[in-house]
């Protein structure tokens, strides 16, 4: 019986194999309808949808439709050529010398061990081979930005929120990417007029700037962000995820738990980390798929050697960690969309296949883009300065109560690169902890600060004020656009937040005294600056002001005897507010810390 079944099975296999070999492949494509199935593709790593690319070629870096007729129009590109592969001069000389030898002399030269070698293979290896054309095509703008760091502000337009949201299909699954570096400035509530907050997945990126480890991010950071979105927008905690596209925090969890659904669109403000997040998901998806495949003997030996080296060296040395991160960054640069610190880098919607799920990278939107007076912080800066600010600084190192600080006296002017000029009222003392990636400076008054920037802008590099050149990153033209803004009354510490750059923690010291003078912040027109409650109050352990028995302590004894705790966000007081155009005479107290704040 078994032999009969086996013979029937063998005969069936032969018929199937003969059927496959007799029908030409061309007839299969012509007689059957083509089917685009993403889930049935066997390990197609980080590729855009090939059918769409063949019909309408787009830049794989920014997503714009390509054209090769007009160099002055957006999307211009040059077709890749198939030239000869470049060969080192030394290798070329050696190749010519080997080719000049006859077979007997070449055997005598190469066959010193007595083994027979294939001479044709050796000659073929030394001959230049044709260069393989790249699979992806980039526009000239992206290539200049990637390989030459050449940028033009006109080629990086920023779309409005209305233009982005109206271009999305009605059945799109939205993933709202929000930066943790300037939270909640990158969260625009106008999105909820197009889609309910309950239908959106919120992904908080750049969390490595807030926490030193992933465990602390999940332990302290996740409860705060879940509380915030639930109190403000009624969002369930399951729809809030903390990530870091730079070091792949929570990316495997995001992919495995089914939080990312098919036909998802990554939306968010400019420089919120959408493209970096997508590159991270593509890279992690590739690694997860590679683990499922069988390793070759060479790959297995290489992996075992790396594991042995890490085990013998402690596996946690800073050099090993840096080397691993550099390797991951190099792999990410070869995958997915282009990511840049330049706002407006992505210009079109780009579809990607992430483990059988279609995801779309969407251009970032700005605020008040349709206004005739639209400007932002990055419109004042050079590309190198944008890169510096966008990197950010670790808040867990520079923004806590243990971090070093500078003391500002009332009437003095505190500035970070000329982005803003903050003047506290007379009679106050302020501790400032800078969490912006540029050195702060304190001037005697605001007039001295303005005069210094004007002098630096009008002099050459060796002028009398050359020592102040590194103090400012804003150009001298920003002085004409400075407008005074006022911080609403507050009690205790606050964060002065700059959109796209970071924040400065301000902690007044001493007994609060009534004053008629407001807190003034001079801001260039278009630069968005808010104030918020200290975010470290809700994501790190801070001083509670009580001893171990629960007794309240005097302020000067806090650091010596106070216990630490993490506050939970309740939403009873405003978390942030915008700067006011008029001074505020409201008096803040311990029981009413933010009397004039509004969200």
Curated annotation (Swiss-Prot):
Residues 158-368 form the CP-type G domain. Residues 322-334 have a biased composition (Basic and acidic residues). InterPro entries: G_CP_dom, Mito_lipid_metab_GTPase, P-loop_NTPase. One of its GO terms (cellular component) is mitochondrion. Residues 1-46 form a transit peptide. Its main location: mitochondrion. Keywords: Mitochondrion, Transit peptide. It is found in: Mitochondrion. PROSITE patterns: G_CP. The keyword Transmembrane helix does not apply. Residues 312-342 are annotated as: Disordered. It comes from the Eukaryota. One of its GO terms (molecular function) is GTP binding. May be involved in the mitochondrial lipid metabolism. Belongs to the TRAFAC class YlqF/YawG GTPase family. GEP3 subfamily. This is Genetic interactor of prohibitins 3, mitochondrial. It comes from Meyerozyma guilliermondii (strain ATCC 6260 / CBS 566 / DSM 6381 / JCM 1539 / NBRC 10279 / NRRL Y-324) (Yeast).
């Amino acid at each position: 019986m078994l032999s009969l079944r086996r013979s029937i099975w063998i005969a069936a296999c032969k018929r199937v194999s003969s059927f496959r070999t007799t029908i030409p492949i061309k007839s299969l494509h012509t007689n059957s309808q083509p089917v685009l199935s993403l889930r049935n593709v066997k390990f197609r790593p980080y590729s855009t949808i090939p059918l769409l690319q063949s019909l309408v070629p787009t830049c794989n870096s920014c997503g714009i439709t390509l054209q090769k007729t007009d160099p002055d129009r957006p999307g211009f590109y040059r077709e890749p050529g198939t030239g000869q592969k470049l060969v080192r001069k030394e290798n070329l000389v050696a190749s010519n010398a080997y080719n000049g030898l006859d077979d007997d002399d070449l055997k005598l030269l190469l066959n010193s061990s007595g083994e027979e070698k294939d001479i044709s293979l050796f000659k073929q290896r030394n001959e230049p081979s044709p260069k393989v054309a790249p699979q992806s095509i980039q526009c000239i703008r992206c290539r200049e930005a990637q390989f030459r760091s050449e940028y033009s502000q006109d080629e990086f337009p920023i779309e409005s929120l209305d233009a982005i949201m109206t271009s999305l299909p009605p059945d799109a699954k939205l993933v709202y990417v929000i930066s943790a570096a300037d939270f909640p400035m990158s969260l625009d509530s106008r999105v909820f007029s197009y889609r309910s907050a309950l239908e959106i997945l919120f992904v908080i990126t750049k969390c490595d700037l807030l926490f030193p480890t992933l465990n602390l991010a999940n332990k302290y950071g996740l409860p705060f962000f879940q509380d915030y979105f639930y109190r403000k927008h009624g969002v369930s905690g399951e729809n809030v995820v903390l990530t870091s596209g730079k070091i792949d925090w929570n990316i495997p969890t995001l992919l495995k738990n089914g939080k990312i659904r098919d036909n998802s669109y990554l939306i968010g403000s400019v420089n919120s980390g959408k493209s970096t997040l997508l590159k991270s998901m593509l890279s992690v998806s590739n690694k997860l798929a590679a683990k499922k495949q069988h390793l070759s003997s060479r790959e297995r030996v290489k992996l075992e050697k790396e594991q042995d080296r890490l085990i013998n060296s402690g596996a946690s040395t800073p050099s090993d960690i840096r080397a691993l991160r550099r390797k991951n960054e190099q792999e990410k640069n070869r995958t997915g969309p282009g990511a840049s610190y330049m706002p407006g880098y992505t210009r079109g919607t780009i579809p990607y296949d992430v483990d059988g799920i279609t995801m779309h990278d969407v251009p970032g939107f700005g605020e008040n883009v349709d206004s005739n007076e639209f400007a932002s912080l990055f419109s004042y800066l050079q590309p190198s300065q944008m890169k510096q600010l966008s990197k950010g600084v670790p808040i867990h190192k520079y923004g806590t109560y243990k971090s070093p600080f500078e003391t500002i006296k009332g009437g003095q002017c505190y500035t970070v690169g000329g982005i803003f000029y903050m003047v506290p009222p007379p009679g106050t003392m302020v501790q400032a902890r800078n969490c912006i990636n540029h050195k702060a400076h304190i001037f005697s008054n605001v007039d001295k600060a303005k005069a210094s920037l004007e002098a630096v802008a009008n002099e050459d590099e060796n002028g009398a004020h050359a020592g102040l050149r590194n103090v400012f990153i804003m150009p001298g033209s920003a002085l004409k656009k400075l407008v005074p803004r006022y911080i609403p009354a507050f009690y205790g510490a606050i964060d002065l937040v700059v959109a796209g750059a970071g924040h400065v923690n301000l902690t007044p010291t001493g007994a609060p005294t009534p004053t008629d003078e407001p807190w003034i912040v001079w801001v260039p027109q278009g630069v968005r600056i808010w104030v918020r409650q200290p975010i470290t109050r809700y994501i790190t352990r801070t001083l509670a002001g009580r001893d171990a028995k629960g007794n309240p302590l005097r302020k000067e004894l806090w650091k010596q005897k106070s216990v630490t705790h993490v506050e939970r966000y309740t939403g009873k007081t405003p978390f942030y507010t915008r700067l006011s155009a008029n001074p505020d005479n409201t008096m803040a107290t311990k029981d009413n810390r933010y009397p004039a704040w509004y969200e």
